[in-house]
A protein has these predicted regions:
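Short, polar/flexible loop-turn hinges at active-site or ligand-entry regions and domain interfaces
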Residues: 22-25, 68-75, 96, 171-173, ...
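Active-site ExK catalytic segment of metal-dependent nucleases
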Residues: 15-21, 64, 166-168
Length: 243
């Protein structure tokens, strides 16, 4: 994938993503659909779709820029991060049977993916899946939009307002707050360079997520988030092995 920045003098006008991969072209379609969906739901501070097309063997996706000259990348979760995600969730949340949600589909996918893992690892993941299912199966849940890659490098803060971009991995019916956990974990790994699980857990216990939601809820959404990440990497590894 190649990303071309389009600008006029010092003003960034937008970005055009280009790829000769059909898989990446599919991700362009997903991001385009998700951006248009969010706009219909009343979400601003996100890129606008300019065009999405295929020509010969290339896929093109052009979108406006949310970055301004004074915008800053923030590596901590601020009130603006909380407010953006809360607004996005409230405007997209739907009440549905758990089994009809994107998150339930994720768990079904994960149960298939773990069959190739060592027995001990597979059993640990299956136990977590069963805990989530026990709580939600057969019940109505209220799930909303999940960005999928909510990180410091996909967000920008300017004049007290948070803008967000790169929605290609988004899902529409997921539990609330998982994006916050992703932001926390990605910052620990790639900014703080912290890989020790014990230290990450200690930091999580001191985070605004733990403080605002309480320990029980913070641990619950961490488990829900880890199921998403494990499935992502297992499914990606399987696809690569088949190529």
């Amino acid at each position: 994938k190649v990303v071309i920045q389009i600008y006029n003098k010092a003003k960034i006008l937008g970005y055009c993503k280009i790829s000769d991969s059909k898989k990446v072209g599919f991700l362009f379609d997903c991001e385009c659909d998700n951006l248009e969906y969010l706009y219909k739901c009343g979400i601003d501070s996100i890129p606008k779709v300019i065009f999405r097309c295929d020509k010969e063997n290339l896929s093109f996706f052009c979108q406006s820029s949310v970055k301004k000259s004074k915008g800053k990348t923030i590596e901590v979760i601020t009130e603006q991060h909380w407010n953006f995600l809360k607004n996005m969730y409230e405007k997209t949340a739907k009440e549905m049977k758990f089994e009809k949600s994107d998150y339930s589909a994720l768990l079904e996918s994960l149960e298939k993916e773990i069959k190739g893992l060592p027995k001990e690892d597979a059993e640990s993941i299956q136990k977590a899946v069963m805990l989530i299912r026990k709580k939600n199966e057969g019940k109505l849940v209220k799930y909303g939009f999940y960005h999928g890659d909510f990180t410091p490098w996909n967000t920008v803060l300017e004049s007290g307002k948070l803008s967000v971009f790169d929605f290609e991995y988004a899902k529409r019916t997921y539990p609330e707050y998982l994006d916050l956990v992703h932001f926390f974990m990605q910052t620990k790994f790639f900014v703080d360079k912290e890989m020790r699980s014990s230290e990450i857990y200690l930091s999580y216990g001191k985070s605004s997520i733990w403080e605002k939601l309480g320990g029980k809820k913070a641990l619950e959404i961490m488990i829900e988030y880890l199921m998403e990440v494990i499935n992502l990497y297992l499914s990606r590894a399987e696809k690569e092995s088949m190529e």
